[in-house]
Amino acid sequence: MPTSTWNRHHVLSLADFTAAEYDIVLKTAASFQEVLSRRTKKVPALQGQVVANLFFEPSTRTRSSFELAAKRLSADTLNFAASTSSMTKGETILDTAKTYLAMGTDIMVIRHKEAGVPNAIAQEMDRLGVRVSVLNAGDGQHEHPSQGLLDLFTICSLVDPANPRLELLQGKKIAIVGDILHSRVARSNIWSLIASGAQVHLAAPPTLLPKLFAEYIFGEETAPPGQLFIHWQLEPALQDADFVMTLRLQKERMTAHLLPSLREYHQLFGITRAKLQLCQPNVKVLHPGPVNRGVEISSDLMDDPEFSLIQSQVTSGVAVRMALLYLIGSGKT
């Protein structure tokens, strides 16, 4: 598997990923996808290493797939729950991380409601001079790198199952619809899709997609080699789209009344079969989950395998997270 050109010790953001790094992840994930199709779905790649899942926020897909990915690589896993930890007694996040370090952890997978926590822990590990890698599993509204990579892998694998690679999305139109303001998934996907040369169209109500969002992300309105477009109506984003990604309304992060009602939101921005008629005939729909049925996407469309890639995203998640753990862990053996 391709590790010779992989030099990244931590995976904290996709903002500085190179095209070569994207392709290494895609190629490695494709190899592990084949492993997962076997009767015995396990390899000894990380045998003897310890992967600690430090989740300070609730999670189903991300936590479970990271745990399964580590076990498929034969690593030992530790699962942390803040509600039953010493943090309830006042222990700090950094002290918690150091506790897991003292137990011999090799890779820390970290999710937290506050942006920057994985970066802070990575910096502390580097300061201590230890060979512990940190993988960001979602931090506040900042980023969710593994989700961005698994979405990229899901799309590229559909275009060319035998050889998923970044260049396959050059010129493709991809719409991202929903609560972009609060979405770490949107930010990671924007970085990866822009890097591929895709045309990325964001669509949401103005309260969930500020006018200066592109400048906030890039410091300018567009970033080569792809292009970023902002729409406050759904139709321009869907017109001739090859892929549509719809995002959950993150009501837990909304500090103000940003929407009149969920019913009105669904009428204006919810994805339905009828609205997909604006897209390319073979359009596919993605959602990172969890899904609010009948809000971001109609229930019948979500369950329709002709259009929906939602279950494929979950499947891809294990292979992609195996790839990430393998790539950052292979230098430790």
Curated annotation (Swiss-Prot):
- The positions annotated for binding carbamoyl phosphate are R61, T62, R111, H144, Q147, G289, P290
One of the GO biological process terms: 'de novo' UMP biosynthetic process
Entry's EC annotation: 2.1.3.2
Binding of L-aspartate occurs at K89, R184, R248
Q: Could you tell me which pathway this protein works in?
A: Pyrimidine metabolism; UMP biosynthesis via de novo pathway; (S)-dihydroorotate from bicarbonate: step 2/3
Keyword Nucleotidyltransferase set for record: no
Question: A Pfam family in this protein?
Answer: OTCace_N
- Keywords in alphabetical order: Pyrimidine biosynthesis, Transferase
Q: GO cellular-component terms in the record? A: cytosol
* GO molecular function terms noted in the UniProt entry: amino acid binding; aspartate carbamoyltransferase activity
Does the keyword rRNA-binding feature in the UniProt annotation?
no
InterPro entries registered for this protein in UniProt: Asp/Orn_carbamoyltranf_P-bd, Asp/Orn_carbamoylTrfase, Asp/Orn_carbamoylTrfase_sf, Asp_carbamoyltransf, Asp_carbamoyltransf_Asp/Orn-bd
Q: Where are the transmembrane segments?
A: none
Catalytic reactions on record: carbamoyl phosphate + L-aspartate = N-carbamoyl-L-aspartate + phosphate + H(+)
Quaternary structure, from the entry: Heterododecamer (2C3:3R2) of six catalytic PyrB chains organized as two trimers (C3), and six regulatory PyrI chains organized as three dimers (R2).
Q: What does this protein do?
A: Catalyzes the condensation of carbamoyl phosphate and aspartate to form carbamoyl aspartate and inorganic phosphate, the committed step in the de novo pyrimidine nucleotide biosynthesis pathway.
Q: Which family does it belong to?
A: Belongs to the aspartate/ornithine carbamoyltransferase superfamily. ATCase family.
Q: Which PANTHER family match?
A: ASPARTATE CARBAMOYLTRANSFERASE, ORNITHINE CARBAMOYLTRANSFERASE, MITOCHONDRIAL
What is the protein's name according to its record?
Aspartate carbamoyltransferase catalytic subunit
Could you tell me which species this protein originates from?
Trichormus variabilis (strain ATCC 29413 / PCC 7937)
What taxonomic ancestry is recorded?
Bacteria, Bacillati, Cyanobacteriota, Cyanophyceae, Nostocales
| Name of the encoding gene | pyrB
